[in-house]
Amino acid sequence: MARGGSFSRLRLRAGVVVAAAAAALLLFAVVAPPAAALNIGLQSAGDGASKAGLCSRTCESDHCTTPPLLRYGKYCGILYSGCPGEQPCDELDACCMHHDNCVQAKNDYLSTACNEELLECLARLREGSSTFQGNKCMIDEVIDVISLVIEAAVVAGRLLHKP
């Protein structure tokens, strides 16, 4: 009985987290200026200065279970991406790179198609995947965190009728 109760509480907490994340993404989509939609280091600095420092050339693994701060590989993380032409660090990073490219092409973080493709890619990795040398994160935890955020984005995209 206690096990069922704790499972119900866990499902309720997960539902609240997904709802809160969807609300945050919805708010972000409404109030964020278009330039903040995807930061891949291509925006003009206005004074001729290079903004290459805003994209990643290093395989990172920081804040593994904290969605807003997560940095994994070169491409996984909110408003975080690899520099143009950078190779992904591993298969998970390749999923994130593909998602970043899709979102960039559609200019829409809430693209249901891009987000569902990322979820499918993440599901394939759950069956087993290697990681890059020096990784400090547990890859399954990173997949769980990214999945939670992207599931919220799918909900928000559907609410806003984003293709």
From Swiss-Prot:
Among Gene3D superfamilies, the record links this protein to: Phospholipase A2 domain
EC annotation from Swiss-Prot or TrEMBL: 3.1.1.4
Q: Which GO terms describe its cellular component?
A: extracellular region
User: What span is annotated as the signal peptide, if there is one?
Assistant: 1-43
SUPFAM superfamilies this protein is in?
A: Phospholipase A2, PLA2
Cofactor: how bound: Binds 1 Ca(2+) ion per subunit.
Q: Which cysteines are joined by disulfide bonds?
A: C55-C83, C59-C89, C64-C137, C76-C96, C95-C121, C102-C114
Gene Ontology molecular function terms on file:
calcium ion binding; lipid binding; phospholipase A2 activity
Active-site feature positions: H99
| Regulation of protein activity | Inhibited by EGTA.
Look at the named UniProt entry and state the broad enzyme category this protein falls under: hydrolase
Keywords per UniProt: Calcium, Disulfide bond, Hydrolase, Lipid degradation, Lipid metabolism, Metal-binding, Secreted, Signal
Q: Does the keyword Disulfide bond apply?
A: yes
User: Which cofactors must be present for this protein to function?
Assistant: Ca(2+)
Presence of keyword Metal-binding: yes
Reactions listed under catalytic activity: a 1,2-diacyl-sn-glycero-3-phosphocholine + H2O = a 1-acyl-sn-glycero-3-phosphocholine + a fatty acid + H(+)
Biological process according to GO:
arachidonate secretion; lipid catabolic process; phospholipid metabolic process
Give the family per the record: Belongs to the phospholipase A2 family.
Q: What is the annotated role of this protein in its UniProt record? A: PA2 catalyzes the calcium-dependent hydrolysis of the 2-acyl groups in 3-sn-phosphoglycerides. Releases lysophospholipids (LPLs) and free fatty acids (FFAs) from membrane phospholipids in response to hormones and other external stimuli.
Protein name per Swiss-Prot or TrEMBL: Phospholipase A2 homolog 3
Q: Which organism is it from?
A: Oryza sativa subsp. japonica (Rice)
Query: What taxonomic classification does the UniProt entry list for its organism?
Result: Eukaryota, Viridiplantae, Streptophyta, Embryophyta, Tracheophyta
